[in-house]
Amino acid sequence: MRYIRRIELNKVRYIEVDMLKALCIVCMIFNHVYEELAADPGGPYVFFDLSSTFLGAASFMLCMGIGMRLARHQEPKEYAVRGFELLTVGQLLNIFRSALPALIGYAMTGRSYFLSNVMLVFQADILTFAGLAFLFVALLKKAHVSDRWMVVIALAMNILNYVLYLTVEPPSNFLVSQFMGFFIVTDAESFFSLSAYFVFVAIGYWIGGIYPDIKDRKAAAYKVLMVGLPAIVIYYAIRINVAIPFYPEFNSDEQYIVNQGTDALANTMVAIAVLAVFCLISDRLGERAKAVTEHLSRNINQYYCVSYMLIMPLLTIMLAIREEYMPGWVIPTLYAVFVLIATNGIIVLNDRYVHFHVVTLKGRMRRVVFALIWVVSVIVVIYTYPRITEYATVWNGYLLP
């Protein structure tokens, strides 16, 4: 009976989870515009930068774990298929977001940093991470690992990743380092390595397993806030003001990438606290607001991909023509608003009239398109790798001026 009840409950959407994902989408778009296109965005960027530090990818991944656990499709094979789909979509995004604009910039200017950025056709981005996470969960489910043990394994992976980061020199070969960067933090583009970030998915997966059985979610939310808020305040008061040995500087790229144990748990506490707040206020949302929130949540991957396609090609144009970024904060803020509105419009128009989604392709067309995406990616690397001596990564600012 419990199994039947769980399947029925899986048909229910939890508006607080949708609200958290929607908040992350909005913050993500503004943050990406400021970071990629603005020279010195100032005031507004401080808020979105801190939102990235305290919530950021952690909330995305926590919600992803919750969604995985509550999904109707629970067979390991279904998880594996979804994982490969996400890897392929991420690879398609890398081609059009990174490789193609950089190749065009190199053809226009001959500047070496453009060619170096072409190698970002393979990078440990968040969609790549999501694909690997689904594949890893498929393996764990095949091995009949329980939800709690999944959390234990994830914490062990996170700790091991940080120890390796502090003690082991990365490989001298960039391609090897990049491949390893999908799994552990290296000196390549390992922004979201599986070992560093899987802890959020695992905790979300565990929460998703118990969430439908919580009879009074509002009462539970109050308890979470009563315990969680003091713990969050105490932790970050220490983290911000005390130099802790072996810890990355607070709010640095290193902290975000390495995502070591206690920082990861603190991010998780913040995400759960925000989820609790949204649970308490969700009844006050009107039907229109709920519809918008659900739309953002359902299309989270599309918002990620489409918004990036309105950001990165513009960066290439700006650098190729004048090697300058947007001045101040007003123009970047207006452009971020435009990106949010335009992304929504593109997604709505596609859903109403075009109905094109790579992952919904069937049969031979699906096999051909998926294979083409991976073949093109490999060809890009074969062309680029022998022609460069420096490799663009987050650690060197992507070699950009």
Model regions: which residues?
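Alpha-helical transmembrane segments and their immediate juxtamembrane cytosolic regions
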Residues: M1-P401
